[in-house]
């Protein structure tokens, strides 16, 4: 009997968490949808409809550089670098490499461009700068939103991170950017810095590299890092899946091993629906 009480407590806790994760999925899904609609309206307003992919990227950079006056926050602690309504509207965030890159990436995605973040790493593998990669004509070219520039050579050809590992091309590209800090070089780069996690980081990266080669090239990882609404929606969906599977396992144990009567959700919903829609009998 004691084990049955423990099981029942676990069963009801699982049902409660399943309900909460369902509510979380619905609310964060609505949040993410509203953010996407906001970004779509924003990008439609600043990017001409018939623009080529490169023109779209350059139009976004031009808006970041020469757009309308931005708000000034007296206290930036209340701003989020992962909320587009903040990164697109506050000058302080558009002056920081991480949040400026997030603003560029969010507008790029909403305009139909494939874009992802790229971390430039120091020798000890800490991030020293953040830029974006945009997929143009089959190549991932570098856009530095902090300096409002697409990296190009002297002929105007956009450059990839592999190109910028060549000292000559790096010098050509950065010479045309006023105030560029040369230490922001491309010898060591990463899309997601899992290795920075304490203890588990290096192990997790090795496991992911073995199980999912090229996993960090995925655009979804970049979206998780740059948009808070999508990150919460992603976590809510996985919580919903986890608790739903856990409920199925517990239901099987209750029916086939412990022989414990339990609330059958489908049967209860069927009875409730039948009662609601049935015509009352008048005597």
Model-derived segments and their meaning:
Residues 147-219:
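Extracytoplasmic/lumenal ectodomains and periplasmic regions of secretory and membrane proteins
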Residues 11-29, 239-247:
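Hydrophobic membrane-insertion alpha-helices, especially the h-region
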Residues 81-117:
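Short N-terminal edge-element motif at the start of the domain
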Residues 242-272:
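Juxtamembrane interface at the cytosolic side of transmembrane helices
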Residues 7-14, 218-241:
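Juxtamembrane/start-of-transmembrane alpha-helix segments at the extracytoplasmic/lumenal side
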Residues 102-171:
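Hydrophobic/aromatic-rich core segments of domains that either
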Residues 27-92:
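Secondary-structure boundary elements
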Residues 1-19, 252:
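N-terminal Sec-pathway targeting helices
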């Amino acid at each position: 009997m004691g084990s049955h009480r423990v099981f029942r407590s676990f069963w009801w806790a699982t049902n409660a968490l399943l309900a909460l994760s369902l509510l979380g999925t619905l609310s964060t899904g609505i949040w993410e949808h509203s953010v996407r609609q906001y970004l779509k309206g924003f990008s439609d307003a600043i990017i001409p409809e018939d623009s080529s992919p490169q023109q779209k990227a350059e139009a976004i950079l031009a808006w970041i550089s020469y757009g309308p006056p931005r708000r000034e926050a007296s206290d930036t602690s209340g701003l989020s670098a992962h909320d587009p309504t903040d990164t697109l509207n506050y000058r302080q965030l558009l002056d920081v490499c991480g949040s400026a890159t997030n603003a560029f990436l969010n507008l790029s995605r909403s305009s139909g461009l494939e874009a992802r973040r790229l971390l430039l790493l120091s020798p000890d593998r800490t991030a020293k700068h953040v830029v974006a990669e945009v997929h143009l004509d089959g190549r991932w070219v570098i856009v530095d939103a902090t300096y409002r520039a697409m990296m190009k050579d002297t002929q105007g050809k956009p450059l990839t991170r592999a190109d910028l590992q060549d000292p000559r091309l790096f010098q050509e590209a950065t010479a045309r950017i006023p105030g560029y800090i040369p230490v922001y070089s491309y010898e060591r780069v990463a899309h997601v810095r899992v290795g920075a996690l304490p203890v588990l980081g290096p192990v997790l990266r090795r496991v992911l590299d073995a199980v999912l080669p090229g996993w960090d090239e995925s655009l979804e990882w970049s979206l998780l890092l740059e948009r808070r609404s999508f990150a919460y929606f992603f976590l809510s969906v996985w919580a919903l899946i986890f608790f739903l599977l856990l409920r199925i396992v517990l239901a099987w144990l209750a029916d086939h091993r412990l022989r414990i009567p339990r609330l059958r959700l489908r049967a209860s919903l069927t009875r409730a629906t039948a009662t609601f829609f049935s015509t009352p009998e008048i005597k």
